């Protein structure tokens, strides 16, 4: 059984309840410990001080595979819409770079990576939050984006390949993550 890490999602993107407020991806300081918590897989780690993590004050996973690493899902804004809402003046180039950065964190974190359908081609839902009652024009995946955003698609594919090829990104046991193999730079 695994749990979605809202700590990582909101540490990167901003609080789900305030779509206009950014966080780490927007260059706003204060959520670095939540990002570290997610990278470590929601387990106890000597460089994670849970008193500074959003939503939790102690590790809630015993093993990193009990945490799902993600930045968006069907509830709430998709990643592209979230970045646009929290950074209204974002350029298309910045959007692509931050999208790639967000997924780099997801795929190089301990835990189980999760991507929302269409994120690999920069899907948007026209800024509609929680679109379960919206029409297909909002919810359908526009596969033409695979052509226009082919470089992003290839980037995601390479992240998946990297994760599969290197066991450091998928350690199932907490001990090597906490005490041997995972160290964060002190400025993060």
Please place each PLM-identified region on the residue numbering.
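Charged, low-complexity surface segments at secondary-structure and domain boundaries
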Residues: 83-89, 137-147, 176
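A glycine-rich phosphate-binding loop feature that marks nucleotide/adenosyl-phosphate handling sites
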Residues: 121-124, 175-179
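Single conserved hydrophobic/aromatic residue that forms the stacking wall/gate
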Residues: 181-188
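Conserved alpha/beta catalytic core and glycan-binding cleft of carbohydrate-active enzymes
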Residues: 1-117, 121-122, 132, 167
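Extended hydrophobic/aromatic segments used for targeting, binding, or gating
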Residues: 125-149, 153
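Catalytic cores of secreted or luminal carbohydrate-active enzymes
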Residues: 148-171
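Short, glycine/acidic-rich hinge or "gate" loops at secondary-structure transitions
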Residues: 118, 172-173
